């Protein structure tokens, strides 16, 4: 969206260009290229976000104090509703979701685990887990604060924001129209980095799973190193193309974040439970575990998709 606002290029064209770029360096450089680019992109992302928040505070009439005053008066700094409703994003529901989704990410997600395996020693792998865990909360808080600061900013300067603008487009609009030229480029690079980092990680981890769990397992001949590398590169290209097609299909959704949460819950549903079964209950048979995962997936599909087909959901 920032690139679209800045250049006027169509969003589908930007999706295709970005996807091809990520596919190329993921396929040619492998996990080393992904880790190094992710590290650099992460630094750019956090640095850009900090600068953006500072600029917002500078531009507000009363600075940080005024931001806190307006945000507090409009209940924008609260932790959310404290009720126990399952149909609203209450504090307890988000806390419950956050605990289990991060337990799955750090314990069962291939895109995380391959980084542990790629570390030189177990000690280095543990350090990466602690670093990621400790950074997660402050970085998330930073972006939440930017969202709140944007709300306060456009309460102070409502004429600067088109009335019919979708929520996902407010941040790109601010970056392109309110920031100095050099800082605009840095912030666009930061947001671009976030998207590229997520895509490259998914491409590389998916290709690794296809090689380790399918191609090597079902191949009748022992694979040479060159054959494995070629398969990884081909898989990276195929997965990257599929990712581009999915992104194009979901272009224009009302909320990218809500859509991501819904898709993540559907496609990753049951995976954490499966890993915990294997870790804690050694006597569970594979068939029993797969039935449990299947039932869990059906339940998630029902709760997530039933409103789109006119059926009542258990949560509503």
Model-based region annotation:
Residues 1-316:
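Membrane-embedded helix-loop-helix hairpins and adjacent transmembrane boundary segments
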